[in-house]
């Protein structure tokens, strides 16, 4: 070919980027970077035409795992394709998938809560699980309380004694009214109580000198054992009475014997 031949006009779009990276006439031209989804270069995609990508083969052609893949559909238009939206994997709950594999799918809150899901409308899933867990704990406590308070089967009920007594009046025995009376102690009981309650007194603790000074001796009180003649005793008593009477009237004084005497000096008999 002749060197003076006119060169082909550069192509625009993705084809221009591919031809610029080849070892053709435009090898000196810098590759035009193409922006992919989320600001990533299209050179990291599957259609990269860089010398490094051509040298290493198909290893660099596949997109890395940590970068979202961009799909470029070949088209005849020169306009760049719109940036594809990032595909979100996983559940709608927002859980991120693990690198090793897809996580086990969790049951929706409606399956966990069951029939009570209607009362949790408008509540987040985490709050719904917490409320359901609290309801389970409350029901478990109530079940434990019911088992403790429940009666044991097989035990006979003992009827009340009051009802049996009211039904059968023949078993009731009439009793006298109970009247509480205070018992009065007698003298003997009081003396016994005083004997045991009072402290013991000894004669040695009492001074009897004042009492013995006034009293007579036992010798003065003693009398001779002489038989009494009732006639003589009565005569002496009558003469003493007459003497006191005459003395009061101013008559003769009675004698020592206490009797009255006549003119001859003989005692006069007293007539009773």
Swiss-Prot record:
Organism classification: Eukaryota, Viridiplantae, Chlorophyta, core chlorophytes, Chlorophyceae
Signal peptide interval: none
Function: As a component of IFT complex A (IFT-A), a complex required for retrograde ciliary transport and entry into cilia of G protein-coupled receptors (GPCRs), it is involved in ciliogenesis. Involved in retrograde ciliary transport along microtubules from the ciliary tip to the base.
Protein name (database record): Intraflagellar transport protein 43
Region (Disordered): 1-138, 244-272
Protein origin, superkingdom: Eukaryota
Keyword Transferase recorded: no
InterPro entries, per database record: IFT43
Organism for this UniProt entry: Chlamydomonas reinhardtii (Chlamydomonas smithii)
Self-association and partners: Component of the IFT complex A (IFT-A) complex.
A GO CC term attached to the entry: intraciliary transport particle A
Gly residues bias locations: 36-51
KW Transmembrane (keyword) present: no
